């Protein structure tokens, strides 16, 4: 048997305090409807795996309640019936949310042993928990090019002639967060007599993604050893000891999540009331500047920290599907 985690008898639930101010409204004989919700929340006693010294602890990390974070934002939804008659309706609906996240505090200790709560690694490479910044803050080296030996070069910000790759290195700079600052969706629907159609567009933005997969496949030293991207030839970087912002990309996207069209046949038969035929497409297209497979990463990833929350080391692509539907309603 081996020890895989340290015991902590003082673990408790995270606590959250939240204030909401909401408004629901309907105007123009209920043709214009909407909601507005403003919130301010604070979560304390955050559960997280922190680094501890060995000894006295047998395992290098311990799950503990340390720190607090703040979330502030606004959520808005609107729907408007552009056409509303007996035979046809056209409704435009959508929602959007904007959020500001901040790490308020990370100080803490267990039984007098201080925890490493400053610049704690969070998910992707070069992503940390830093007081005063959003969770998943990227502190990273700035790519400047390559030298005569085709080795990547980065900016020496403090000018001391040494590239410091330490967590608190003065050569690192804040380059954004893995957490989106806004999300949105657009959901129009149309009906004319027995025909109906609807779609769902959604997206998010304001976040960064560290494309670790692209980084691993962009070194010419790996030619003949493993796969290398065609773009690596143009970049011409033979090797690199750095994880620079060359691989940090915008994670914004717009996705056509769903498109459905259908027609309903009505019967006077004593057994069948209606038969509806429909055609549905899911994940039909994606608009993004991200060069990876998909900018919408799973927060849980594969279970490895480097694959979580803003890090992409290779994910399964989302399935694109087209389905035919038949719905029979009996009397």
Model-assigned labels for residue ranges:
Residues 1-33, 61-85, 177-182, 311-323, ...:
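Outer-membrane beta-barrel signature, preferentially recognizing the C-terminal barrel domain
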Residues 64, 81-178, 282-292:
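Conserved small-residue
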Residues 201-284, 289, 295-298, 302, ...:
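Extracytoplasmic gating/loop element in the C-terminal half of outer-membrane beta-barrel translocons
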Residues 38-44, 80-82, 96-102, 192-194, ...:
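Transmembrane beta-strands of outer-membrane beta-barrel pores
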Residues 21-25, 36, 76-80, 186-192, ...:
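Residues on the lipid-exposed face of transmembrane beta-strands in outer-membrane beta-barrel proteins
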Residues 63-71, 118-146, 227-230, 238-243, ...:
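C-terminal beta-signal and terminal closure region of outer-membrane beta-barrel proteins
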Residues 12-57, 97:
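Membrane-embedded beta-barrel scaffold of Gram-negative outer-membrane proteins
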Residues 15-19, 38-44, 60, 70-74, ...:
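Transmembrane beta-barrel architecture of outer-membrane proteins
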């Amino acid at each position: 048997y081996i020890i895989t985690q340290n015991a902590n008898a003082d673990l408790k639930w995270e606590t959250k305090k939240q204030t909401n101010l909401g408004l629901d409204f309907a105007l123009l004989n209920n043709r214009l409807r909407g909601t507005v919700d403003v919130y301010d929340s604070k979560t304390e006693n955050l559960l997280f795996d922190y680094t501890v010294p060995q000894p006295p602890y047998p395992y290098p990390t311990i799950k503990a309640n340390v720190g607090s974070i703040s979330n502030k934002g606004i959520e808005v939804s609107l729907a408007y019936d552009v056409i509303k008659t007996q035979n046809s309706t056209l409704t435009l609906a959508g929602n959007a949310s904007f959020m500001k996240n901040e790490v308020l505090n990370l100080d803490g200790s267990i039984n007098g042993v201080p925890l490493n709560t400053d610049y704690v690694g969070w998910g992707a490479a070069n992503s940390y928990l830093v007081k005063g910044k959003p969770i998943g803050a990227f502190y990273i080296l700035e790519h400047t090019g390559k030298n005569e030996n085709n080795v990547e070069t980065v900016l020496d910000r403090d000018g001391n002639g040494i590239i410091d790759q330490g967590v608190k290195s003065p050569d690192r700079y804040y380059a954004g967060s893995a957490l989106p600052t806004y999300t949105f969706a657009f959901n129009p629907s149309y009906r004319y007599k027995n025909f109906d159609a609807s779609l769902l567009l959604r997206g998010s933005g304001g976040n960064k993604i560290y494309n670790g997969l692209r980084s691993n496949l962009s070194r010419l030293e790996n030619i003949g050893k493993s796969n290398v991207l065609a773009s690596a030839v143009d970049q011409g970087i033979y090797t690199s000891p750095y994880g620079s912002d060359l691989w940090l990309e915008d994670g914004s996207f717009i996705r056509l999540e769903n498109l459905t069209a259908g027609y309903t046949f009505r019967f006077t038969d004593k057994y069948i009331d209606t038969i509806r035929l429909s055609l549905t497409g899911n994940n039909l297209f994606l608009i993004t500047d991200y060069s990876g497979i998909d900018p919408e990463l799973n927060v849980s990833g594969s279970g490895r920290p480097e694959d979580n929350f803003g890090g992409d080391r290779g994910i399964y692509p989302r399935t694109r599907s087209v389905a035919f539907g038949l719905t029979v309603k009996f009397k």
